[in-house]
């Protein structure tokens, strides 16, 4: 069990994504009662990766977009960054895949690691990740998700699946934690040069 991340589905249902080393990436849903004394599994080990290859599913992160639509980011066995969308029923018993895209490139070793996503507006997502050169460098990348269909898209008229990209650190961008402060203001905590900790703030427009 590595890279676990939670999202809330409804008042007492939660989704957990994680990487099972050598077996792929999985999504499991749980019901947790009001006083947290009872935890019951609703959907067990739904595999969200394309394969069960050794490294498929690393750096998994899940985000609730709204109206039962969820976004999962991860890296596959060929070191490619992948975005997938799913619907999850309110009771957590049904998980349905909607779309799958290589965010940066379908070429091997394009890298998208240490992922942390936030919702920008109802159809735009920002992700902090490392990438490009041997999984180094710190990046912020934005992309669109149709909230009703789950279709992932980039800037209008572009073949890319991302809207925009910003390299904020030329050396390193690991252990990312990206949060929205409010309005168009965002703050990122991450590990950079020398494994030192850094905090950087950004503005991101609603359209990414």
PLM feature spans:
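Extracellular, repeat-based ectodomains that mediate carbohydrate processing or recognition
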Residues: 1-208
């Amino acid at each position: 069990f590595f890279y676990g991340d939670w999202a809330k589905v409804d008042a007492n249902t939660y989704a957990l994504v994680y990487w099972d080393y050598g077996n792929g990436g999985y999504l499991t849903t749980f019901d947790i009662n009001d006083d947290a004394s009872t935890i019951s599994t609703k959907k067990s080990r739904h595999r969200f990766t394309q394969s069960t290859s050794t490294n498929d599913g690393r750096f998994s992160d899940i985000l609730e977009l709204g109206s039962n639509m969820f976004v999962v980011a991860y890296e596959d066995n060929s070191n490619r960054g992948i975005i997938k969308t799913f619907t999850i029923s309110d009771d957590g018993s049904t998980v349905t895949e909607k779309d799958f895209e290589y965010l940066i490139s379908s070429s091997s070793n394009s890298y998208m690691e240490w992922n942390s996503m936030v919702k920008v507006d109802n159809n735009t997502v920002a992700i902090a990740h490392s990438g490009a050169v041997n999984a180094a460098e710190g990046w912020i990348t934005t992309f669109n998700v149709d909230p009703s269909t789950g279709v992932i898209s980039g800037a209008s008229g572009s073949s890319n699946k991302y809207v925009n990209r910003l390299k904020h650190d030329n050396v390193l961008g690991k252990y990312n934690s990206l949060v929205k402060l409010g309005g168009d203001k965002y703050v990122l905590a991450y590990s950079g040069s020398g494994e030192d900790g850094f905090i950087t703030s950004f503005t991101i427009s609603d359209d990414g």
